[in-house]
């Protein structure tokens, strides 16, 4: 009855006033309406429409393969090259990232691990955020891990300022950090800032999707982490699982600009080729599970609730899919 009422109301109002869901998006006009897109001029709009049609074609051709649903999202009007540059600016230094890693695997003293583990069911994680047109995934991942620790260990629900990390670890502002604002950055550098200075809450230093000069005098309580540790490069699944269970959600760097992950909707993403050169996106692992014999990781992204399943995605576990096991970092309070 409720569905019929909504349908009737939509039929009575002007055409186009009822927004389709992301799965129902079939035209560029629908895409603009759902995601509130406004372009600078006709030339840009034509270019964005071309990219949208390419992504829509890809989604329609791949939907349902291996039981995975793909969907249009906010980034569907970007070219593949633009999207990849948007994530990392093409500026991640893998030599530096590997230098931060532990040299040895964890000592295997953790015994058996549960088949399913999900921090969303054990603590109140903060809302899914949207990094928008700024390549600040590294800041969102680090802040999100710290927020999770405060929820898990102190039962405090706080939303920390990613913008402070973007601005105040910008190496042109403070050369002791290796970050480039919206261009690229490292969650390990963000943790260093949280150790030294701490972060204020989002409401005190709001996010605005651009790099600006740091405001060190912003008022508000500061929240710190006491340390961080990056696991050995290409850690085993068991080491990563144990770390999540013992220390809370972890930051990982992965290949995020491929169309499979970019357009992920529902289902477990499987069998995507990967190499180090494509590492370009930081996200959070909040747990793992198994469904119909397929082992998977639970990923918390920073692309809004329109991506994946309400902002979370599921990627096959057991094959270092998308490089998930390569760069794994946890923090401590």
Swiss-Prot record:
Superkingdom of the source species? Eukaryota
- Could you confirm whether the keyword Aminoacyl-tRNA synthetase appears in this record? no
Task: Name the SMART domains on file.
Answer: Inhibitor_I29, Pept_C1
SUPFAM superfamilies in UniProt? Cysteine proteinases (SSF54001)
Recorded hits in Pfam families, A to Z, give: Inhibitor_I29 (PF08246), Peptidase_C1 (PF00112)
Q: Cross-referenced CDD domains, in alphabetical order?
A: Peptidase_C1A
Keyword entries, A-Z:
Allergen, Disulfide bond, Glycoprotein, Hydrolase, Protease, Signal, Thiol protease, Zymogen
Q: What is its EC number?
A: 3.4.22.-
The glycosylation sites are 93
Where is the catalytic site?
137, 281, 301
Q: PROSITE patterns, alphabetically?
A: THIOL_PROTEASE_ASN, THIOL_PROTEASE_CYS
Propeptide cleavage-removed residue intervals: 19-108
Any GO BP annotation: proteolysis
Here the disulfide bonds are 134-182, 168-214
Q: Which major enzyme category is it?
A: hydrolase
Q: Where are the transmembrane segments?
A: none
Entry annotated with the keyword Zinc-finger: no
Q: Which family does it belong to?
A: Belongs to the peptidase C1 family.
**SUBUNIT field:** Homodimer.
Q: Output this protein's name.
A: Cysteine protease
Q: To which species is this protein native?
A: Blomia tropicalis
């Amino acid at each position: 009855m409720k569905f019929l009422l909504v349908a009737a109301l939509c039929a009575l109002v002007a055409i186009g006033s009822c927004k389709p869901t992301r799965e129902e998006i079939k035209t560029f006009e629908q895409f603009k309406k759902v995601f509130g897109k406004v372009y600078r001029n006709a030339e840009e709009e034509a270019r964005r429409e071309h990219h949208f049609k390419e992504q829509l074609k890809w989604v329609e051709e791949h939907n349902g393969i291996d039981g995975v649903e793909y969907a249009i999202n906010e980034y569907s009007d970007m070219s593949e090259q633009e999207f990849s540059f948007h994530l990392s600016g093409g500026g991640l230094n893998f030599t530096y990232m590997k230098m931060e890693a532990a040299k040895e695997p964890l000592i295997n003293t953790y015994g058996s691990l549960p088949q399913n583990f999900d921090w969303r069911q054990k603590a109140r994680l903060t809302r899914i955020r949207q990094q928008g047109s700024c390549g600040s995934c590294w800041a969102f991942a680090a802040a999100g891990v710290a927020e999770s620790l405060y929820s898990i260990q102190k039962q405090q629900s706080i939303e920390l300022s990613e913008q402070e990390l973007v601005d105040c670890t910008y190496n042109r502002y403070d050369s002791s950090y290796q970050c480039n604002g919206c261009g690229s950055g490292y969650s390990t550098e963000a943790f260093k800032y949280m150790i030294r200075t701490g972060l204020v809450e989002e409401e005190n230093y709001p996010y605005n999707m651009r790099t600006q000069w740091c405001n060190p005098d912003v008022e508000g309580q500061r929240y710190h982490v006491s340390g961080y540790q990056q696991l050995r490069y290409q850690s085993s699944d068991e080491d990563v699982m144990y770390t999540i269970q013992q220390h809370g959600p972890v930051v990982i760097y992965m290949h995020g600009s491929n169309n499979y992950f970019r357009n992920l909707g529902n289902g477990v993403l499987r069998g995507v080729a990967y190499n180090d050169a494509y590492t370009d996106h930081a996200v959070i692992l909040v747990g793992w599970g198994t469904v119909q014999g397929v082992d998977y990781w639970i990923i918390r992204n920073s692309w809004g609730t329109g991506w994946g399943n309400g902002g979370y995605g599921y990627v096959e576990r057991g094959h270092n899919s998308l490089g998930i096991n390569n760069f794994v970092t946890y923090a401590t309070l």
